[in-house]
Amino acid sequence: MGSEMCIRDSNKADVVCYLPLDSRRRVKKFIQIVNPKLVLFVKYEFWPNLLNELKRKEIPTILVSGIFRKQQIFFKNYGDFTRKSLRAFHHFFVQDNNSKKLLETINFKNVSIAGDTRFDRVSMILKQDNSLDFINEFKDNKYIVIAGSTWREDEELLINYINEKATDEDKFIIVPHNIKQDSILELQNSINKKSVLFSAKSNKDLKEYQVFIIDTIGVLTKIYQAADVAYVGGGLKTGLHNILEPATFGIPIVIGNRYQKFKEATDLIDLKGCISVKNQQEFNEVLIKLKNKDSLRISSGKINKKYIQDNLGATQLIMNFIKDKI
């Protein structure tokens, strides 16, 4: 999905490409061809041979939105090789104080707490027109749950809830991670409510359907604006997807229980803007509770929106550093 986003936004770049496999020969050739003046790594992308080559060539290298945990190999007794690769970084911009302290334990002082640049990106969503006529037609001013970036394990919870607990007035939009035709048809055939696919929506009266399955990419961010509740997939097994996008719209969020590696998720769980579930029973209880308690939905949504607003500014801080130092 990251590469798809880069390609979609490729008008902002001269070239979009994959990094080579991290071998000395390949990265040496890659750097020779690209000849970068500055290199930015984001979050937790660490390629030892690439970093070592950047250091050898004395190319300014910065880590952006970095986040570190004590379980990482950098902080182990046997992590000398990986620690050595970190010396390529001229500066570390990290998300939190814990990351800064961990780097200091291995003698890196060139560290600033800047936060996560994704907050600045998602906040820009509100400045664009997010209205989609086909979504508005489908919603028809009814209560709607939007499930984004779902995997099979997420969809099992949704299917059971829709089939067994949903009233005729409830509406659902499901945006699967896997949009291969066989998977989409399997999902649709598992739902006993009236459903429609994005790819088959032409000439359909969308307000007559209860479930809308989006079998395309690139529209999820705008779709979230219509949600009363958002469920973000990946948190049960494969890795939690982006919860900042629904949060910026001020929507309560439900996720799976494997969220601990995602700072924004742990923060919003603690703040009570986000709720985690681990099984069908909890999923059912949470969705029913959110539907029945307007005050809970409103308060959770406000928490999420404020969280985005309180964490803006990382991009400008980093850009100022680049202008001043590089």
Where are these regions (language model features)?
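Catalytic binding pocket for nucleotide-activated donors in carbohydrate/polymer assembly enzymes
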Residues: F89, T105-I106, L220-G301, K305-K306
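Nucleotide-activated donor-binding/catalytic signature segment of Leloir-type glycosyltransferases, i.e.
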Residues: S10-Y18, L185-I214
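C-terminal alpha-helical cap of glycosyltransferases
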Residues: N311-I326
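Active-site-proximal region of nucleotide-activated glycan assembly enzymes
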Residues: D14, Y18-R25, K37-D120
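Short acidic alpha-helix that forms the nucleotide-activated donor recognition element
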Residues: V27-I33, N203-Y209, G218-D228, T248
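Short, small-residue-biased leader/transition segments that mark boundaries at the very start
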Residues: M1-I7
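Conserved catalytic-core segment of nucleotide-activated headgroup transferases in glycan assembly
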Residues: Q128-K201
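Short internal beta-strands
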Residues: S3, F92-Q95, K171-N178, V254
